[in-house]
A protein has these predicted regions:
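A short helix-loop-beta-strand connector motif used in the catalytic cores of GNAT acetyltransferases and
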Residues: 50-51, 62-78
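Conserved GNAT-fold acetyl-CoA-binding loop/helix
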Residues: 42-63
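Acyl-donor (CoA/ACP) binding surface of acyl/acetyltransferases
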Residues: 1-29, 33-43, 76-194
Length: 194
């Protein structure tokens, strides 16, 4: 595995799968990804405004996301096929908190045509490795809807453990949805500076 990451940018390569921080120049590709997967992702995501599917909407969003990257408060990453540059999915870390929590939440999406090939399992493994080893976090939290067996399988493969069940947890596609709550703990966590 090749790793050229820094404290403000993710860049990890596993075979032909590249995990990297989204940049301003990615607005076209990201808008195209969400347009192409709009119906497929709809049951798993919040209702989106039209700007979410537009290049201009993503230009504005990426400016804000890049500021969060620079401040160490959030990371929005893309899963890309390195040989072709094709975008396969997204992995985002939000609600980043340092002392005393050292934790964050993770969310992700994968293109319909990329399902069933292990891309998200590999990508999420690389992404969590970055958050633990570069960002020095102790805990990463993820939630999934009980009927989303693919997400359950990905999280289990990466090592997330079930912690609870939250009723009406997130507003997904206009409906409050229950979620199973999971976490991944960094077993090698050390205080910064050690």
């Amino acid at each position: 595995m090749e790793d050229n990451s820094s404290s403000i940018a993710v860049h990890k390569l596993d075979g032909d799968l590249l995990l990297r921080t989204a940049e301003i120049g990615d607005a076209d590709m990201i808008a195209e990804y969400f347009q192409a997967n709009r119906e497929y992702l709809k049951p798993f995501e919040p209702k989106r405004e039209e700007a979410f599917f537009s290049v201009n909407g993503w230009l504005q969003k990426l400016i804000k996301l890049n500021e969060l990257h620079r401040m160490g408060l959030g990371y929005y990453c893309l899963l890309v096929r390195a040989s072709s540059g094709e975008m396969l999915g997204t992995i985002s870390f939000s609600s980043l908190s340092r002392f005393p929590f050292y934790s964050c939440n993770v969310g992700y999406s994968l293109a319909e045509k990329a399902q069933g090939h292990g891309y998200m399992r590999r990508g999420l493994t690389m992404a969590c490795d970055y958050m633990f080893n570069v960002q020095k976090l102790h805990r990463i939290q993820a939630g999934y809807m009980p009927h989303n067996k693919r997400s359950e399988s990905v999280l289990e493969h990466v090592g997330f453990n079930r912690e609870g069940y939250a009723k009406d947890y997130l507003l997904i596609n206009g409906e409050w949805q229950d979620h199973i709550l999971t976490s991944l703990i960094n077993p090698n966590w050390q205080p910064e500076g050690r």
